């Protein structure tokens, strides 16, 4: 983000995009990337891991995941100051972030649990016990080795301008 936050960095990014523009298939809906792969229209894609997992586990597509260089986000819980329902909100947060509950959730969809303590408890896919869900989690130590955390502050400060510039580039 340090380099992308400079004009030189933005110019370098767009210069790189210029070199691949004619070879990129842009998608707009999450169902598109697995279909583009299945149809042979693309040889690789960026997408949500749950979509690719579904194609692998339920549609038996011969896809794989590469976590190296993944970009990940964080989700947060917030209780507004002065909330009349503070105790209920705290109860919900305790319930929804329970270590075992998060591990159980991972048997349905491979979205990494927010507690590291859940990772050793992750089992198999709810409808196919031969599928070890840990192999599909983005939050294992191996998967996170070269990951980049999305910088919310950077995008709050620069997102609008970069999106406008990207859309103008895309239109040309």
Predicted regions and their residues:
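Ligand-binding pocket segment of bilobal, Venus flytrap-like solute-binding proteins
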Residues: 1-64
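Soluble non-cytosolic domains of exported or imported proteins
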Residues: 7-11, 28-31, 83-87, 99, ...
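Non-transmembrane alpha-helical segments in soluble domains
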Residues: 14-18, 34, 38, 46, ...
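Periplasmic-binding protein-like
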Residues: 15-19, 59-83, 126-129
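Sec/Tat-exported extracytoplasmic proteins
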Residues: 20-24, 41, 56-59, 96-100, ...
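Conserved C-terminal helix/tail region of periplasmic/extracytoplasmic solute-binding proteins
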Residues: 35, 140-172
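Solvent-exposed loop/turn segments at secondary-structure junctions
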Residues: 50-53, 70-72, 84, 100
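Mature extracytoplasmic/periplasmic domains
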Residues: 80-146
């Amino acid at each position: 983000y340090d380099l992308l936050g400079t004009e030189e960095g933005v110019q370098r990014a767009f210069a790189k995009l210029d070199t691949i523009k004619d070879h990129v298939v842009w998608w707009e809906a999450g169902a598109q990337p697995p279909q583009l792969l299945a149809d042979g229209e693309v040889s690789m894609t960026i997408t949500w891991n749950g979509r690719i997992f579904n194609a692998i586990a339920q549609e038996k597509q011969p896809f794989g995941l590469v976590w190296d260089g993944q970009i990940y986000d964080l989700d947060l819980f917030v209780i507004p100051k002065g909330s009349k329902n503070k105790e209920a909100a705290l109860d919900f947060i305790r319930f929804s972030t329970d270590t075992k509950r998060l591990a159980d959730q991972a048997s349905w969809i491979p979205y990494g649990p927010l507690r590291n303590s859940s990772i050793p408890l992750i089992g198999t896919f709810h409808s196919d016990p031969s599928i070890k869900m840990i192999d599909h989690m983005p939050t294992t130590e191996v998967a996170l080795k070269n990951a980049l955390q999305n910088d919310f502050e950077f995008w709050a400060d620069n997102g609008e301008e970069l999106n406008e510039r990207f859309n103008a580039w895309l239109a040309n």
